[in-house]
């Protein structure tokens, strides 16, 4: 693409590869710098190649585009640099990092450096070809959510680099039965405590874990091992650091001038101005960059609800309505549709997943039928109802039975992911294990039940690291997971159960081929609130089925009669109360016989022993 065409599309909000134009581009003759600063009277590049003096290398404007350019023979790969921008209205001089910078010095430093062209040779062509033809809606999608800096660390507390992480994380995730990793934001960010959600480098992998090529090698290794990698991406807001995007050229360039439109009071961050064409090109190009240059398999888009509503977390008088008088952010809606159309069009098989917590309709429906175009949406309602129910003492659960059954009313209105994410194990909420009631045995039994509840309920899955083995304390970004707890038999048993549940979900068509269809789920009995028992069938597209039975109290239910579709032998595929998983080992001897005879409106019936705080999965032989 010629520069004139690239500039035109950039100003039109339709340049999805603006990273080829803007930023720092090195070659044998030096480095060319370009930056968008339409309200500047002067722009200089300052760096360690010119003593950080603004008078040495002044950029020249490229017509009326607002973009400035200079070729600097003295600047080469590895050189640090910033932009010195003089506002045309006030004369104020601002020292800014490069919005399109591809690498930054390690915090607390914030200067960008000139990044060399990638030398990584990709070996994942087979993976990408397979992904392009992947019918993900009928496939098992089981996501392990990971904060790379705190999953596991060196004994001295230093985080692993990408290569070291690959050696440990990839085999672990595969052994646990996950299909994808989802990395909390690894875009550059100054504050560890933000977990990456306050991004300052939308085109730069954080320097905490190594170079850009080391990240490429990590993703490549995942793909060659059969593991997908999703990126948590944050287009909803950005931090107020004065050296970054905020008031970039002395004006509200990437954000809105009016705080009623441009400020997130909850997070102390700025909201992008999605109606500004160049901001649209910036964000679209960021998404394209990660999927193209790093081969990520999709994006989990953070805080979508905050983007959709102009009155999000605002009181009356603290927000401005749209041109129709409504509270919908029309520009953000249009941006999200454009984003999803680009991802699905340019990267076949790549996923987009919305963290969206409201009842906004058709989030995961195609744009051509009026939807936002996401592949999937987190089911926050299911997650909240489930955790609320499991937190209750079993003696009271009979009066809250609907907290578990209500989700099926809307379960197929979207393509849902069932998440137990990082947000549920921080800020005083306790760990998943810590939310469970009862004595030690009951707490672990409830945790096993919760793990099974997620996997056996229709929907794709997401589990935050550490939850799979019942970490006792809250997660902290400042330390590694409590791997030492696996010396505790209960934690090791929970880890085994999690792996077996994941493999069951992966291997049984009945548990994944109709995750998004009401045809894949059928209640056997959802009304036994007196005993806090639920039972259902999961159906595969191939006609296969499994019987699922849950007992949410510590009282065993022997000889519990259920109606089933067919007479014959039913094998007990999984029992969360097995001694292998730390349970009391109450079960069904491995198999049951269903006899002909109508029960619950079905032609056959069987009597199953449902263990205390246990779940059983049965399959007709």
UniProtKB/Swiss-Prot annotation:
Biological classification of the source: Bacteria, Pseudomonadati, Pseudomonadota, Betaproteobacteria, Rhodocyclales
Keywords: Carbohydrate metabolism, Glycogen biosynthesis, Glycogen metabolism, Glycosyltransferase, Transferase
EC number(s) on file: 2.4.1.18
Family from the record: Belongs to the glycosyl hydrolase 13 family. GlgB subfamily.
Biological role stated in the UniProt entry: Catalyzes the formation of the alpha-1,6-glucosidic linkages in glycogen by scission of a 1,4-alpha-linked oligosaccharide from growing alpha-1,4-glucan chains and the subsequent attachment of the oligosaccharide to the alpha-1,6 position.
NCBIfam families: branching_enzym, PRK05402.1, PRK12313.1
Subunit record text: Monomer.
Catalytic residues, chain numbering: 302, 355
Molecular functions per Gene Ontology: 1,4-alpha-glucan branching enzyme activity; cation binding; hydrolase activity, hydrolyzing O-glycosyl compounds
GO cellular component: cytosol
Organism: Dechloromonas aromatica (strain RCB)
Protein name: 1,4-alpha-glucan branching enzyme GlgB
GO biological process: glycogen biosynthetic process
Catalytic activity annotation: Transfers a segment of a (1->4)-alpha-D-glucan chain to a primary hydroxy group in a similar glucan chain
